[in-house]
């Protein structure tokens, strides 16, 4: 069985928090809000390109502010289950934010899909953007890749910061630790 990425866990934490203050039942609209709020993910990038933000989704959620315990509704459960199916279809080991976004728009009757439909966003819109991002090599990085990129950037900054280095023989920084010989 497929699990969920750390980003999806963040999405669900945000969705649960919002559901607590807006009626207690966690729905796709809360998950959609979480997708908007978790930055550097496929879903937030797609939604940002389409002009959908947490503020936009939040306006719909704020209409029903009744504090209570959070219970996930059946549409949200189906969305999470369907996200795992999409992850499997894309040969991904874990369901990620873009799989959840696809699952939300797949169910046209869900509250999240209805919010997006008002912006003329449907399953095909999301799928086309996702396929385009994948074809162009645009993919959110995992934490280890982010750390490696950070160290590469640091190496470049260190190398440029050495103006006396005429021979361009700066030693690379390996995993953030420079070896002394």
For the regions a language model picked out, list residue spans one by one:
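Histone-fold recognition with a strong bias for associated Lys/Arg-rich disordered tails
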Residues: 1-181
């Amino acid at each position: 069985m497929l699990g969920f990425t750390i980003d999806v866990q963040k999405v669900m934490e945000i969705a649960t928090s919002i559901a607590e203050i807006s009626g207690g039942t966690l729905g796709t609209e809360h998950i959609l809000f979480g997708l908007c709020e978790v930055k550097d993910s496929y879903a937030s990038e797609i939604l940002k390109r389409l002009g959908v933000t947490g503020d936009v989704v939040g306006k719909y959620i704020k209409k029903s502010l009744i504090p209570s315990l959070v219970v996930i509704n059946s549409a949200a459960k189906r969305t999470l289950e369907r996200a795992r199916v999409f992850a499997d279809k894309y040969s991904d080991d874990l369901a990620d934010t873009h799989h959840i976004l696809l699952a939300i728009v797949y169910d046209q009757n869900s509250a999240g899909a209805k919010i997006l439909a008002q912006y003329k966003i449907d399953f095909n819109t999301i799928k086309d953007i996702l396929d385009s991002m994948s074809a162009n090599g645009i993919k959110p990085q995992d934490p280890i890749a982010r750390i490696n990129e950070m160290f590469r950037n640091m190496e470049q900054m260190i190398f440029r910061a050495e103006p006396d280095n005429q021979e361009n023989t700066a030693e690379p920084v390996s995993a953030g630790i420079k070896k002394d010989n």
